[in-house]
Structure formats: C-alpha cells, structure tokens
Amino acid sequence: GKRKVFYAVSGLVIGIGIFSMVTRGFNWGVDFTGGRTYVVAFDQPVEANAVQAALEPVFRGEDGRQYTTSVKSYGGAKQMKITTNYLIDLPGTATDSLVDVRLQKGLGDLGTGFAWPAKESRKVDPTISDDIQTKAWTSVLFALIFMFIYIAIRFSNWQYGVGALLSLVHDTLFTLGLYSILWGVVGFSLEIDEAFIAVILTVIGYSINDTVVVFDRIREYMHDHKRDPVVTVFNKAINSTLSRTINTGFCTLLVLLIIFFFGGLSIKGFVFGLFFGILVGTYSSIFVASAIAVDLLKDREPAAVAKPVTA
C-alpha cells in the first residue's frame, strides 16, 4: 500500500543522481579514456594543485598542445595519483621512457623528494580503451536484457520481467549517480573503469537473486490464495520473506564493511560501490520490483466469490 511512497523516494534519489551525471559527470579511468597513470609517494605532504601546476609545463607538446593531466591525493597528502594522456598516441618504449623523464622533471621542480620508480604505473592505448569501453557497457546491457528474459520465462509473466528489469536499471542508475556525486569528495578513487563494471554486474547478479526469492514466494502465495486481491497476496508474500532478505543482505554488507575498513586503499572504491549497490539492490528487490509487478498485475484481480444459493 506504500508503493507511491517508494516510487517517490526512488525517483527523487535517481533524479539527483542523473542531475549530477549531467552537471558533474564522472571521473573516467584510463581504462575508458586511454593514458598513463602513476601512483607516486613523496617525502613530505604536497598539494594536488601544486603537483598539477608543476606537471602542466612539462606535459606540453612541441606544437604547444597542452595535454590533459589530473592529480588526486591517494591515501593521504604524501601520495598522489597522476593521470595524463601525454603522447599516448605515440607507441614505443622510447616514448614511454620520455614520458617518465618528463614526469620526474616536473616532480623534481616541486623541491620535494619522491620515490621512483612509481609505486604503481599503468598505460592504456586509446584504441584499447575504446574497445574496453564498448565491451564493458555492452556486457551491462546484455546482462539486463537476459535477466528480463530469464525472469519473464521463469515466472511465465512478462510483468515480473518488467518489474525485475526496472529494478535492475534502478540499481544501476543509483550506483552511477553515487559515483558521480562523490568522486573527488571521498578520500579514495571512484573512477569509472573496468572495476566499476565489475561492481555493476555483481550488483545486478545479487539484486536479481534477491528478486527471484521474493517472486518465488509471491508465485507460491498467488497459487494458494487465488481468491484474494493481488495486492493483499503480494503484501503477505513480501512480509513472509522480508526477514530472510534483510538478514542475507545484512550479512553480506557486514563482510563488505570489514573489507572496506581493513582492506587496502586500492580496493576501497570497488568495495564502496559494492556496499551501496547491494544495499540498494536489497531495497529494490522488495520495494521496487514487486511494486512494479503488482501494478502491472492488478488487472488480474479475481472475480468476486459467488455466494451459495440456498433452497
């Protein structure tokens, strides 16, 4: 009976996320943009803006082109993550060595000691990044389509398939919006890269599993209570499986919380996305997927039970 409330809450949260996607955009990783990324440790705390200002002159082409460079703190003020597309279109080890030399020169101009080689370094060619991006989003699209088909066939009703599909889209948009709103705000990386696609696919898989459990119970109750109104049957079925769904979600979230606080910095963004994605996936499997399904099935209300005729 609270479907409109849940629709409003979900619509508001998703709307804020979409607004952020349009206005702020995303922190695209080199997997999707192409470029080089380095994690450099310094002897003393440094400002990200100061590091970027020192690198911009050295990452300028001979034709005057200013290549894109971004610098973000990575686990504290003594460690920076540097990303640049400087000479990324030119292949060869000589180019790689030149970029390393230019980077060291720019960092040396800061006057602060730093460790070299970099703690982490990675290079992704533009053609490879385009291919990665296409395959990544295609995998998400196919996952959504196949989940819709699976649910529709399993429960012999397209209404269930639509409910499951829209709840998965809801979870995906929520996670995208979260990354858009919080990148640059939290103290760890929230890049849109291959790891993020793994987050989305994991959330989709977890959410659809929860949804199947709820829909199975609904189907069972629909079979046993054929004379009851559809909304009443849905409410009874959801209430009967509510504790199981919440307990399962709580145990999963507890494990992720422990990994987040005690795991390394490099996986914090991944675990962060999983935590909130699974949290909203648990919510949507109960309050979004079933709400949409019941609205689509309301035209199947049972006919009134005829009263027996007495002589």
Regions found by a protein language model. Name each.
Residues 1-311:
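A structural signal for conserved, well-ordered secondary-structure elements
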